[in-house]
């Protein structure tokens, strides 16, 4: 039976305050249920109503045409995302409202009002046009977390160019692969970026990448660090010089709803990166609405999502979602612990952040650094917290709730993917009770199903399987850029006719979904299928443990043995006695079947630059492989892998 066993029990339930509930957009479980049923029964009526809150140059003739894997949304409708994110607000009192509040790692501040941003975006749209960029051309953006990244994205959408943002932490090789795949005409980069007090050599990486990626005709360089950088006359241009010469009026291109908006690459475990393609109308409508309801956005909110624009979270919930809602969005350039581990909390207090959205990996780091750091700050402006990027273990959830939210801020634990475009499963903060470790319920219009290996629905509560989506939703990816076969093979071949997320999940008796991690992060131990996330959660619940990553290694008797890589909190030291204590602890929390066969202490875990643990590398290390295979372009610190190999 291809079913995931779920073994970690977390029974506590938390409710939003009456005061929060009264003010929320969706105020009760009953209201959620009524709207959800309508969104499933009449998706065209529901999404047509939502899309009507935005501006369309020409109305659609049909809201939804066709079905998975190739639905079309808002057919015949014409709109422009930058118009909806900027022009719509500039015509109202929001004209002089802060759109982007930015802080650089060294401490500089910039505030761009909606009017400022509108003018800058139009200027840069004209710059792109003068460089020969036309509708449908691809533009690669390789920048630090600075306002110019958002300006460049919005300028592309204004003229119908397709942007491909590449995370500034990626290597020259990873950048070259992504430029070549998209056949980008223009590259936008900076002389460098600041990270932990050092300088990231973006221009140097760009020059290296362009030796291999020859489609690029022009490189626009933002002066960020003032470093001397190599220069290719005729090809390279300073951002500020081009902007000085550009007019600040550029009419938005009228875009068909299904025309391409952006490509964003996700790393496959092997082979070349996948270029996920999102289109204009459906993506715009869905991120607008999810941002509004999941974060319960109000006009007075100061909203901060800590993601980098190089990831989908940065696209949907740093730039597009907040600006479509006329919100104030905070951008921060640097590391959470630079110069000290309270940098995030300083920013929260300084700007009066009300809604805060970050990753579980960051929360576990905050736990490791101790309560003293957030304890130095008031944090009383916060009213709502969120998590994104991976399942959050109950221990980290409870710490976040009590230490950062002071027990008064609801937490939205959001499940979604690059491919889904927007949040798919979550609690709505005024409507739902929260269960630590459970993402929550499907967002409007989202119809999940948990299937076993034989494509049968898993009916029993708390029995796991593959998380699939059975109906189209507006912001889903439309294809893999240049590779339609890979699109079908990757997402629609495992369970015919439905979208397969690659994640395992279970649904409890109340309809709450718990995400069990990637299906390929499932262990088969003596015929039992165990989700790695549950064993990791049990380990992290031990007071000595800061972080844990669990993988399987081949075992002649059990099929797979359980290997746990563990980092300890400050004040705890590795010992054989602690190893035994941790093994016994897991056996007690989950059951003897989940007792790790081996525990390896380490000072750090190998992570991608977005903070996800690279379990694939840990599997290779656990199996004793001397050479690390597969794509490691997203690995943040290679020395971690070397130290783990030496300690093997």
Curated annotation (Swiss-Prot):
Recall the GO molecular function terms of this protein's record.
acetate-CoA ligase activity; AMP binding; ATP binding; metal ion binding
Reactions this protein catalyses: acetate + ATP + CoA = acetyl-CoA + AMP + diphosphate
Q: Name one Pfam family in it.
A: AMP-binding
* Record note on modification: Acetylated. Deacetylation by the SIR2-homolog deacetylase activates the enzyme.
Binding-site residues, CoA = 195-198, 313, 337
Q: Which terms under GO biological process does the entry name?
A: acetyl-CoA biosynthetic process from acetate
Q: Which EC class is this protein assigned?
A: ligase
Does the UniProt entry include the keyword Ligase? yes
Name recorded for this polypeptide: Acetyl-coenzyme A synthetase
GO cellular component terms listed in the entry, alphabetical order: cytosol
Alphabetical UniProt keywords? Acetylation, ATP-binding, Ligase, Magnesium, Metal-binding, Nucleotide-binding
Instruction: Relate the protein's function as given in its record.
Output: Catalyzes the conversion of acetate into acetyl-CoA (AcCoA), an essential intermediate at the junction of anabolic and catabolic pathways. AcsA undergoes a two-step reaction. In the first half reaction, AcsA combines acetate with ATP to form acetyl-adenylate (AcAMP) intermediate. In the second half reaction, it can then transfer the acetyl group from AcAMP to the sulfhydryl group of CoA, forming the product AcCoA.
Q: What is its EC number?
A: 6.2.1.1
Ranked from the top, the taxonomy reads: Bacteria, Thermotogati, Deinococcota, Deinococci, Thermales
């Amino acid at each position: 039976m291809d079913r995931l066993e779920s073994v970690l029990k977390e029974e506590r339930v938390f409710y939003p305050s009456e005061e929060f509930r009264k003010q929320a957009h969706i105020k009760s479980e009953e209201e959620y249920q009524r709207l959800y049923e309508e969104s499933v029964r009449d998706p065209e009526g529901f999404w047509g109503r939502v899309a009507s809150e935005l501006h369309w140059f020409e109305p659609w003739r049909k809201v939804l045409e066709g079905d998975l894997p190739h639905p079309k949304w808002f057919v015949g409708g014409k709109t422009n995302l930058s118009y909806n994110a900027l022009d719509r607000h500039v015509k109202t009192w929001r004209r002089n409202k802060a759109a982007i509040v930015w802080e650089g790692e060294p401490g500089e501040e910039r505030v761009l009002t909606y009017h400022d941003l509108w003018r800058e975006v139009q200027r840069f749209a004209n710059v792109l046009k003068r460089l020969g960029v036309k509708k449908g051309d691809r533009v690669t953006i390789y920048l630090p977390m600075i306002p110019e990244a958002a300006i460049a994205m919005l300028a592309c959408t204004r003229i119908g160019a397709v942007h491909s943002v590449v995370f500034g932490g990626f290597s020259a090789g990873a950048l070259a692969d992504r430029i070549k795949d998209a056949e980008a005409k223009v590259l936008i980069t900076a002389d460098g970026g600041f990270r932990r007090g050092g300088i990231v050599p973006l221009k140097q990486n760009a020059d290296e990448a362009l030796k291999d990626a020859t489609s690029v005709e022009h490189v626009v360089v933002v002066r960020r660090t003032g470093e001397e950088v190599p220069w290719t006359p005729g090809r390279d241009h300073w951002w500020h010089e081009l902007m000085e010469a550009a007019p600040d009026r550029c009419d938005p291109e009228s875009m068909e709803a299904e025309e391409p908006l952006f490509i964003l690459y996700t790393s496959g475990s092997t082979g070349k990166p996948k270029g996920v393609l999102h289109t204009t109308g459906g993506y715009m409508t869905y991120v607008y609405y999810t941002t509004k309801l999941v974060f319960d956005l109000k006009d007075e909110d100061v909203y901060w999502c800590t993601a980098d624009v190089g990831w989908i979270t940065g696209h949907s919930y740093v730039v597009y979602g907040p600006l479509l809602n006329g919100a104030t969005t905070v951008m921060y350039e640097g590391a959470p612990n630079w110069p000290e581990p309270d940098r995030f909390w300083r920013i929260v207090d300084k700007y009066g952040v009300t809604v805060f959205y970050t990753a579980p990996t960051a929360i576990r780091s905050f736990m490791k650094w101790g309560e003293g750091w957030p304890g130095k700050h008031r944090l009383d402006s916060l009213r709502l917290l969120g998590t994104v990027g991976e399942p959050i273990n109950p221990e980290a959830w409870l710490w976040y709730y009590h230490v950062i939210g002071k027990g008064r801020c609801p937490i939205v634990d959001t499940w979604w993917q690059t491919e889904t475009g927007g949040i798919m499963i979550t609690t709505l903060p005024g409507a739902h009770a929260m269960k630590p470790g459970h993402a929550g319920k499907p967002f409007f219009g989202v119809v999940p199903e948990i299937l076993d290996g034989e494509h049968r629905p898993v009916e029993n509560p708390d029995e796991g399987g593959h998380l699939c989506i059975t109906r189209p939703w507006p912001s889903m990816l439309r294809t893999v850029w240049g590779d339609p076969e890979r699109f079908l093979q990757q997402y629609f071949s495992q369970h015919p006719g439905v979208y397969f997320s690659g994640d395992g999940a279970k649904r409890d008796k109340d309809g709450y979904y718990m995400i069990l991690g990637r299906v390929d992060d499932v262990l088969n131990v003596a015929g039992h299928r165990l989700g790695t996330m549950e064993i990791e959660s049990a380990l992290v619940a031990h007071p000595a443990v800061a972080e844990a990553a669990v993988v399987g290694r081949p075992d002649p008797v059990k099929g797979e043995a359980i290997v746990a890589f563990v980092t300890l909190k400050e004040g705890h030291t590795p010992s054989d006695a602690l190893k035994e204590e941790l093994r016994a602890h897991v056996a007690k929390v989950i059951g003897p079947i989940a007792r790790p066969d081996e525990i390896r202490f380490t000072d750090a875990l190998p992570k991608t630059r977005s903070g996800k643990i690279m379990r694939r590398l840990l599997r290779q290390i656990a199996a004793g492989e001397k050479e690390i295979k597969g794509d490691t372009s997203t690995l943040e610190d290679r020395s971690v892998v070397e130290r783990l190999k030496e300690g093997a």
